[in-house]
UniProtKB/Swiss-Prot annotation:
Region (Disordered): 1-27, 94-113, 126-151
Lineage: Eukaryota, Metazoa, Chordata, Craniata, Vertebrata
UniProtKB keywords: Activator, Biological rhythms, Differentiation, DNA-binding, Isopeptide bond, Nucleus, Phosphoprotein, Transcription, Transcription regulation, Ubl conjugation
Native species: Mus musculus (Mouse)
Crosslink site: Glycyl lysine isopeptide (Lys-Gly) (interchain with G-Cter in SUMO2): 122
Record's protein name: Cyclic AMP-responsive element-binding protein 1
Covalent link Glycyl lysine isopeptide (Lys-Gly) (interchain with G-Cter in SUMO1), residues: 271, 290
Region Basic motif, annotated ranges: 270-295
Summary of the tissues where the protein is detected: Expressed in the heart (at protein level).
Keyword Transcription regulation on entry: yes
Family assignment from sequence similarity: Belongs to the bZIP family.
Amino acid sequence: MTMESGADNQQSGDAAVTEAENQQMTVQAQPQIATLAQVSMPAAHATSSAPTVTLVQLPNGQTVQVHGVIQAAQPSVIQSPQVQTVQISTIAESEDSQESVDSVTDSQKRREILSRRPSYRKILNDLSSDAPGVPRIEEEKSEEETSAPAITTVTVPTPIYQTSSGQYIAITQGGAIQLANNGTDGVQGLQTLTMTNAAATQPGTTILQYAQTTDGQQILVPSNQVVVQAASGDVQTYQIRTAPTSTIAPGVVMASSPALPTQPAEEAARKREVRLMKNREAARECRRKKKEYVKCLENRVAVLENQNKTLIEELKALKDLYCHKSD
């Protein structure tokens, strides 16, 4: 037992000495490793494909070549795809922008056209107003109109119109209409109708004018018609038409016979057309029913004829039978 314990003590002492020496060697190796790290350098003949060779100088002066464990990175076999930058043009946005530009230009053109045109509401208000003055339509004057020379004033003779009843109608430049009978004195039988808005217009246009009678009543009539109020209070409309210059002297225009207002005439014509259409439909229906009735009668006659034939044959047979029995 004593020998075993002594051996154990010796082993433990040796282990302690060994540990102390290892610690001392480790402490001494640290500056040596630092020295080696300072002295070490890569081999000059090392290439990228061969492993790196490092020269290590020991403390005793010996030099040792150490191959590096860390190898240089080899080029990868997998190649990364080439990235190409593609510029995509947005067609939809360009079309939208083009449409927006077109809409802006269209709206500008429409605004310019509306600014050039006269105000239709203003014209309607002027026509519906009771003011005897001539309405004015303000329009933008073009450069050609502003640069046009001065217009000379020409005096036009007063036109005289004669109706089929013998009345004379004179229209002055101010828009007044004077009426005179053929058999009466010119001063006593003179009637004046004041027409507003009697300005000259372009041919082919229809202008409604106000005709003022002697009692102060205003009537809206077309520019080519004349309204005449008789002594009894009846108002008649005369439509003026220009006759050929070969038959009548210039300045004299014949007027047609008094015409009914257009609206009642159109209403009467429409009613007449409706009545005629209904009559045609009724006559067509009557003819159809008549044909059906005649056909039915013909069928009945044919049936009765067949029955009559059968009865005649039966009568003959009975007569023959009676004759045979009597014999």
